Amino acid sequence: MSTSLKHTRIELNNAVFSLPDIVAKAEGYFIDEGVDVELVLPEKRKAMLAAADAPIKQHSAIQSFLWHEGIEKGEFSVYHACEWGQMRRTQDTCAGVKVITKRAAVSTQAIIVRGDSPYNVPQDLADVEVAVNYHAGSHYITLGMLAGFMKQDQVKTVHIGVPNQRFKAVMDGRIQAAAVMEPWISAAEKLGFKVICEAFYNGLEVADPSVDTELFDALRRAHIRAVDKINQDIRPWLHHLTAEVPADIVKLETSDLHLPRLRYNHPEFYSPAEFQRTYDFMVERGLINPESTFDKLVGGRAAELGKVGAQLAS
């Protein structure tokens, strides 16, 4: 390890997404790689958690960065989020941010309704508003999950901020359905809510130009060790997830979490083929500019490694 530590800041997201960062820091894996990592809870996210958003029905009325806007202001240099949203935000960046790799967390989101809801299958949600966070995983996964069951114009979404706000809106009867990730899916099941449909999806890591090749490789090695630690036994780390659910909603125990929902892989390079599938989906729905190609959104070194990986797999 180098005697001189390189410092960088990584955004702290929902625990289910950021668990490899949390583990790598707690176990000293970043330090082992010569990197002093500061995990940053963005100021914008603090504000969003504290105050509920008014429902908004047009995705164009919401700026794509959400609480991730801190990377544009120098608040942090690396963050990860859903694949679709990262493509959109990388298109919109003014800070030279690029995709560098796939996220270690392979997350799931579910559309939930209350236990007394008349809805039971995806088809029942035709023309029913589903609460999502526009330009985030809940938004895109809802479009994808419902697309096979109804016409595109029958999929109705409405923006209601962060997951605790969407959950509470369903709980209070202000909205009929919402898309949420863990630990909120388990909280819903504990309260007798119904899961209408559920799907896994990839995320991407992006970084500003301060993340050079050496730092990129060091972070990736630390994340690989963290994933191995998590997959060896995730149970000591589950309290990070359950802590996100306030006790006045439900007292969620670590034993309430369904462990097969929690998937973590070694970070993989993002291939042109994967990009193209998501690009086509987004262009068809007017969610990204047709000019936002792989070469424009994916960082140079990551792009080359992604192409090599695709060639080796073919």
Q: Where on the chain are the PLM-derived regions?
A:
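Short, glycine-/small- and polar/acidic-enriched structural segments
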Residues: 2-143, 148-150, 176
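A bilobed periplasmic-binding-protein/Venus flytrap-type ligand-binding module shared by bacterial periplasmic
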Residues: 23-25, 109-119, 200-216, 263
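Short, hydrophobic alpha-helical packing/hinge segments within bilobed ligand-binding/sensory domains
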Residues: 45-48, 66-68, 165-169, 184, ...
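Juxtamembrane helix-loop boundary signature in multi-pass membrane transporters
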Residues: 152-156
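Pocket-lining segment of extracytoplasmic ligand-binding domains
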Residues: 157-158, 162-244
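Secondary-structure end/capping motifs
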Residues: 213-289
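Conserved C-terminal helix/tail region of periplasmic/extracytoplasmic solute-binding proteins
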Residues: 283-314
